[in-house]
Regions:
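Catalytic cores of nucleotide-sugar-dependent glycosyltransferases that transfer UDP/GDP/TDP-activated
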Residues: 1-506
Length: 506
């Protein structure tokens, strides 16, 4: 076979294909157009077949005919179609929930690759079954479609959740090239979430012991096996490369920094008509929620990302806002802080969004727009109450916590996330653990000044691109957090909040 001239088919596997959960959804969607331009009809995205797969359109194309035959021979049930994003990539949604005996599956992974799954719960078993089914699908398509044409196949797997798929491909069709990309390490995320500084003495950390102590041995074990067995191992930033080397036992072959395709993002750097109109809608909706009109000069700040209070810096953001509220008392300053952090909920809270001043949250102003699960124990709501961020009329800082996905149908703003973001005055993303950081990158791309940190992959990349003295003029502020205490970080962030609140219009 002439490898230089043979056609390459690329399979890309993620739990977030047509299923937005976190940042990997942005990773996949932002490069789909370029992948289609390069690989054409030889590019396939594989995701989970769920009750609801937003953006998926099942299609009856001639291109699927040969695939259906190959899948049928292995009794693999899939939905075949396109994803309504730029590039309209081909998508295979894989059914998996009734295909396997989980005990047998986990035993096979232990026997073949030494994966220790004993401590794994359903949040581990479900993605293992999904990824294994994806591995079978890739093997079936390679054997029925690619191999007869003397082509080559490469399969890319995102995160530990797809690690079992890589191991399955390696076992069934070892001639298929495999790539494993980790966007964070399970151990790094878990340790950082407890408040530990994982970077200062990383080389002294014993991964197996720490994984056991945090009850994540199963996830760490399959992640390590996937990194070890992959033909190529990549991660998204040098800082995560350090983690991977120590925690997973393999140095990445390539650092694949994340990006955004600016061709599909509107340029709002000069023409602000659309963000201005969105701002008007946000201000009206917020005023109704708060039972009082916000001043026109109100500064709108946003924080978003995974619901990880410490890792994403939500804790220091709320602390900094509370200090700002005290400092601004008696002034005409006004800050509206949008906490756009997705969490479990049962729908919009009709009383909260009614605008009726007689509707209250046990006598207090509402903070949250939706009915969150276990509200008395919700970390964001509790932190706001403890810090005095209670939305009383006299407060200079008002906060609105929206735990719903902003897909244009959230029941509160009913505006997509990117449009809400573009209408803000600044995005605050003061992360403690952030392997890359799509949220500040998206903020900058949508022409909104953004704050990130030197513990973020994007922050470190941005700092390398700019001269230190010119950073504040680029619209990206990289705040130091490495080696700093909680209070020191709050002090720094508080200064930035006050500075942003005092910025003149325009």
């Amino acid at each position: 076979m002439n490898f230089n001239s043979s056609v390459v088919t690329l399979f890309e596997v993620s739990w977030e294909v047509c299923n937005k959960v976190g940042g990997i959804h942005s990773v996949v969607t932002s490069k789909a157009l370029q992948a289609v331009e390069h690989f054409g009809e030889d590019y396939f995205l594989l995701g989970p077949a769920l009750k609801n797969n937003p953006g998926f359109e099942e299609t009856d194309e001639h291109a699927w005919d040969s695939l259906r035959m190959g899948l049928a021979t292995r009794d693999l049930k899939c939905r075949l179609g396109r994803w309504n994003i730029p590039g309209r990539p081909k998508v295979i949604l894989v059914e998996f929930d009734k295909r396997y005996s989980s005990n047998q599956l986990l035993f096979e992974m232990w026997k073949n690759y030494g994966v220790d799954s004993l401590s794994g719960g359903w949040d581990y078993i479900e993605p293992v079954m999904f990824a294994t089914a994806c591995g079978e699908v890739i093997a079936a398509i390679h054997e029925s479609r690619v191999e007869p044409m003397q082509g080559r196949s490469v399969a890319l797997f995102h995160e530990w959740m797809c690690g079992a798929g890589l191991l399955t491909v390696k076992k069934l069709t070892p001639e298929v090239g495999t790539v494993f990309t980790t966007h964070a390490t399970t151990l790094g995320r878990a340790m950082a979430g407890t408040g530990r500084d994982i970077y200062t003495n990383m080389r002294n950390i014993h991964p197996a012991n720490e994984a056991a102590a945090l009850n994540i041995t199963a996830k760490w074990s399959i992640e390590s096996a996937a990194a070890r067995e992959a033909d190529a191992f990549t991660t998204v930033s040098p800082i995560t490369g350090e983690e991977s080397t120590v925690f997973l036992g393999r140095q990445p072959d390539v650092i694949t920094t994340n990006g955004l395709d600016l061709r599909v993002i509107p340029d709002y750097t000069e023409d602000r008509a659309v963000p201005s109109a969105t701002r008007t809608r946000i201000m009206a909706t917020a005023s109704r929620f708060l039972r009082g009109s916000l001043p026109e000069h109100t500064r709108i700040f946003a924080i978003s990302g995974r619901y990880e209070m410490h890792n994403k810096g939500v804790d220091i953001f709320l602390e900094a806002l509370a200090r700002a509220d005290r400092n601004l008392a008696g002034t005409n300053s006004s800050i509206l802080a949008l906490c756009l952090v997705m969490g479990g909920h049962t729908g919009v809270n009709a009383a909260a969004v009614s605008g009726n001043p007689d509707d209250t949250d046990n006598g207090l102003p509402f903070i949250c727009t939706h009915r969150v699960w276990n509200a008395p124990q919700d970390p964001i709501i509790n932190a706001c109450r403890r810090l005095g961020l209670d939305n009383r009329a006299e407060r200079r800082v008002k906060i609105i916590f929206v735990p719903a996905m902003l897909d244009g149908h959230d029941g509160f703003f009913d505006i997509p996330y990117e449009e809400v973001l573009a209408a803000c005055d600044m995005g605050f993303f003061p992360s403690w653990y952030e392997p890359w950081g799509y949220t500040p990158q998206e903020s900058a791309a949508w022409a909104v000044p953004t704050l990130t940190t030197d513990l973020s992959g994007f922050g470190m990349w941005a700092r390398e691109q700019m001269k230190e003295e010119s950073m504040d003029r680029t619209g990206v502020c990289v705040m130091p957090r490495r080696g700093m205490s909680f209070d020191q970080s709050v002090d720094r962030l508080h200064e930035r909040v006050l500075g942003a609140a005092a910025c003149p219009d325009g």
